């Protein structure tokens, strides 16, 4: 194998974390910075009880989410008018350019998710949407849910 040949990379758990523009802490996984990825990133996210992200979208990049554990409310679409309740084991696909905002639906349990994006520089395509953060229907989530 030559010096320029692609090779596998291992990124050890606990390698580090960073504060995302979305207002949450991400645990570093696969990205351009950690593994030389060219077309994807893959991270672990833990949302504390009652925590939420800032309203945002990912310009030109798709996202896939697997909720490992917990319960989350996801607001999405134009004006964040669409809503789904997510449970551990659920998968979510988010097309590029779709506004979204996840909320941990539990007051006592964290929500943990694996997130993959078609952007190896994960934070570069994040576009914050502060005008959506204070929408009236977001101030009172549709019921709280405890995980068990």
At which residue positions do the language-model features occur?
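Conserved hydrophobic/aromatic beta-strand scaffold that supports enzyme active sites
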Residues: 26, 42-46, 64, 83, ...
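Histidine-centered divalent metal-coordination motifs
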Residues: 56-58, 100
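A short, N-terminal "cap"/entry segment at the start of jelly-roll beta-barrel domains
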Residues: 1-39, 54-55, 128-148
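A short beta-strand-loop-beta hairpin characteristic of the jelly-roll/cupin
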Residues: 52, 61-88
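Ligand-binding loop in jelly-roll beta-barrel domains
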Residues: 83, 87-88, 96-124
């Amino acid at each position: 194998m030559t010096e320029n040949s692609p090779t596998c990379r291992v990124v050890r758990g606990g390698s580090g974390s960073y504060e995302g523009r979305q207002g949450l802490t991400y645990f570093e996984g696969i990205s351009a910075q950690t593994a030389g990825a060219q077309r994807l990133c893959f991270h672990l996210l833990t949302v504390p009880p009652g925590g939420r992200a800032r309203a945002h979208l990912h310009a030109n990049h798709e996202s896939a989410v697997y909720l490992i554990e917990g319960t989350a409310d996801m607001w999405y679409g134009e004006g964040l008018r669409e809503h789904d309740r997510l449970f551990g084991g659920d998968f979510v696909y988010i097309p590029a350019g779709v506004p979204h905002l996840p909320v941990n639906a539990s007051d006592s349990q964290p929500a943990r998710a694996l997130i993959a994006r078609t952007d190896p520089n994960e934070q570069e395509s994040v576009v914050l949407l502060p005008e959506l953060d204070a929408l009236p229907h977001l101030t009172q989530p549709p019921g709280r849910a405890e995980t068990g």
